[in-house]
Amino acid sequence: MRKINGFRAILSPQFRLVRIQGRIQGQAGLRFVEEVWKETGRVDDAFSGMPYDDITAAIDYYFENYNDGRPFIIAAHSQGSAIAQIVLANYFKEHPELNERMIAAYIIGYGVTPEYLEANPHLKFATGEDDTGVLISWNTEGKKSIEENADNVVVLPNSISINPLNWKLDDTYAPASENLGSLVANEKTGEPEIRDIGADAQLVLDRGVVLSNGEFDFDAVPEFLKKIFGPESFHGNDYTFFYNNIKENVAKRVEAYLANQ
């Protein structure tokens, strides 16, 4: 347990990432994820077993020893969000009292689908900027991926996204002027800093992603990952592009939750 970014305490459980033939993550693990995705349309099976067991063991220990009945927020990304969906579907179904204390689950960088929500009626997707007990998700892409309708391992068919600047579910455009600041590396020191990089946001509803049109001075995705994520996926920037807006949104949802207690 640790304190960070103005929050009282953060649990950051460690888990074993996707393995294949004894090699961890890297291109081998990603190829395995891609194979599972092509066979099933989801990558859940790639994360079953040890990763899921690691997470549930950590969650059990946290709620039994540290939580003391307090409300909480879930934040995850990519593989973590895929596992979080499994946890929310299974563990939270077995422990319904936790749903009442969950302020929100930011499970970003892996698609949430209507089929998933229908199969898990105890879960609901966010509809605005301050509803609580909700799931929040998006995947960020550039024009090239969208124009080519490129395969992206984390963008599932029928994915639902919310706009991280205006917190709407429609395709209302949010210009970069609504972005409160992105988290980027300082060009000289390499240290993280908040800067305006021109990251706007608009939902592309038929693909279920957030389109960001900024003129960014870095590659969207490494060359060896383009086969899996597409030519212009901003997967690694799902949080950082909209960093200060997310921080503000967390505060609004906490305030709304506490106001209803």
PLM-predicted stretches and their roles:
Residues G29-D44:
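Cap/lid segment of the alpha/beta-hydrolase catalytic domain
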Residues T40-R70:
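Helix-loop module immediately N-terminal to the HCX5R catalytic loop
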Residues R2, D45-D53, S78, G236-T240:
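Soluble non-cytosolic domains of exported or imported proteins
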Residues R19-I24, I73-I74, A104-I107, I136-S137:
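Structural recognition of the beta-strand scaffold that forms the well-ordered cores
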Residues M1-G22, G29:
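Short, surface-exposed "cap/lid" segments of acyl-processing enzymes
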Residues A57-D68, N90-F242, K247-K252, A256, ...:
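Surface cap/lid and interfacial helix-loop subdomains adjacent to catalytic sites
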Residues Q85-A89:
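Short, hydrophobic alpha-helix immediately C-terminal to the catalytic nucleophile
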Residues A75-A84:
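Gly/Ala-rich beta-loop-alpha elbow adjacent to hydrolase catalytic centers
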